[in-house]
Amino acid sequence: MDTVLQTLAERLVDADATVRRLAVIDLPYSEEDDIVPLLLPRLIDEDAQVRTEAIRALEGFEEPHVVQALAPMLLDLDPGVRKAAGEVLSELKEPQSAGPLLPLLLQGPPEVRALALHAVRALRSPEAFGPAMQSLRDPDASVRREAVGVLGYLKDPAAIGELAEVAANDPEVEVRRIAVGALGYASTVSVLPALTRALTDSGWMVRDEAAQTLGKLRLSLAIPDLVRAMQDDYWQVRVKAARSLGLLKAEAGLPSLVASLTHTISNLRKEAVIALGEIGDTRAIAPLEAALADPDPDVRKIARLALASIVLAQKAKAEGAGS
């Protein structure tokens, strides 16, 4: 062991917690290739700040024994330690790393369960499906929110019914919103009732998510509902509805999209122009020409592109009919 590393090793066991904490912070910047053996003992240091820094220093190390040591840190008595553990564990990339976290999905206080669910989400571990489904009925909103996130990542059709129920009835707006977004992985129209119902949710963010998800799924049966959403009290919802009407090439949306070209919010005017270009109906030419005088330069630019798109589409259509 070289002199620098020897000094760090001595500082790691110093009687002064501040010295130990600074040694932990310095360790990743040393030239030592394998710092894990020096860091792991500091996970059980008597000082919470030392434990916290040791956790942070272990970020990016995904060997099984490291994950096995980090997972129990979610149960630490110190909230700062638990938070750091949750952040580091949520950066895991390998599916097999979910193993040590699975037992924590249904045990411990709500904060621990929520952190564990968040950590396994991106790992897409099939073993997390059952605990996540069970957690949809947890009394704690943060646990339910993370459970919905896990199911959204897993994309298992068996969860669609439960997610639709959560989207409609969970008492927390954010949980309902995430559930609506999670329904976006469905490949059938079975989610249509849940999504159209969500367009009338009391929370505007839920309605916003529903309008976007309907376009993502290209559910043309939702066009009448999206047209109604163009009258939503929140312009953010109208923006998503306009975007989806464009993706669906919904001619039924022309009147509401044209009306939006004079809205005070430029973002809505932009989306309306884009949607009219995507729909490609010649009835939109005159309103789009008027949009060339819009005070927002982006709206004017997009209007020119939309007009060019409609003209080219009509030309191609005419040439196709004549051949």
Predicted regions and their residues:
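Alpha-helical segment of the N-proximal tetratricopeptide repeat
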Residues: 7-30
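Non-membrane alpha-helical segments in proteins
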Residues: 21-26, 48-60, 83-87, 118
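Short inter-helical turns and helix N-cap capping residues of alpha-solenoid HEAT/ARM repeat scaffolds
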Residues: 15-16, 46-47, 77-78, 108-109, ...
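Core register positions within helices of long alpha-helical scaffolds
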Residues: 26, 57, 88-91, 119-122, ...
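Amphipathic alpha-helical scaffolding segments comprising HEAT/armadillo-like alpha-solenoid repeats
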Residues: 1-11, 32-44, 63-75, 94-106, ...
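Ankyrin-repeat and related helical/solenoid repeat scaffolds used for protein-protein interactions
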Residues: 231-305
